[in-house]
Amino acid sequence: IMFRQERGALMAADGYSRMNNRRKFGVVITQGGPGSENAMGGLAQAFGDNVPILYLPGGPALAQHSVQPNFSPVRTYQSVSVYSEVVWKSDMAASVMRRAFHHLRNGRPGPVIVGGLGTAVSITSVRSGDCAPGPALA
């Protein structure tokens, strides 16, 4: 669903997670810069109310990630999330998303943030075998 304002998108994802008794969770994707900055209120509310939401913020290209004045939502929103991580290379995407879903389903409920899924990662091809889960631990 397309929203005109990021806070409204977070509120809808919050409501979806609550209506599904936290067994299913809302997912929000925003543009970088002002779009990810506007998500703060919704993330803080979800964190305070223990509502699981997967947030995928847009951001600068990975080569410009630490260049000032670029805004880093993953770093900025660590205090209002139960888990946050950046996908630095395309071959990390499967394992990062696996950890993100683990945190959404286990432990204290709350927002999980995965950044870095911009053009540098999304246009890189990955072999399908790379996405298979690892062996079970005894």
Question: Model-flagged regions — what are they?
Answer:
Residues 1-138:
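N-terminal alpha/beta PP-like core and its mobile active-site loop of ThDP/TPP-dependent enzymes
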